Amino acid sequence: PAPTFTDKMQSETRMTSTSTAHVPTTSGSRYLQQLSKHWSHNLDVQFTEKHSRIIFPKDARGANWSADAVVTMEAQPETLDVTIEASSPEHLEALKGTVARHVDRFAFREAPLTFDWG
């Protein structure tokens, strides 16, 4: 059976690697919504104009991570704040690249954007 929302929430408690980037842009809400709609075709996505939460399954695209990862995005007036919670440092690094590439696709007029992961 497919994992339930509770299963997904419990898997989040096992995550060990987190990073946040404050990406300079005044179009954060637009990019957040476009990317959320794009990912909602294949991933569990919840979003509003200002907030998005995307769950990347541990076995997405043939991967074998120890737990699901969660990407949250918050649209601020001058930044798009992106946080990744992953199961390992390697998982985190892989998702940093995935997220940056996808945001840059929707932000093509001002890409590449600066992701100051910290």
Please provide the spans of the model-predicted regions.
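Structural preference for solvent-exposed beta-strand-turn elements
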Residues: 15, 19, 49-52, 76, ...
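Amphipathic alpha-helical segments
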Residues: 28-41
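Terminal, regulation- and interaction-focused segments at domain boundaries
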Residues: 10-31
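Ser/Thr-rich, low-complexity intrinsically disordered terminal regions
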Residues: 41-65
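Beta-strand/loop substructures that line and gate deep hydrophobic ligand-binding cavities in soluble
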Residues: 62-86
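Beta-strand elements of well-folded, non-transmembrane domains
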Residues: 25-27, 58-62, 86-88
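C-terminal structural segments of small proteins and small subunits
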Residues: 83-117
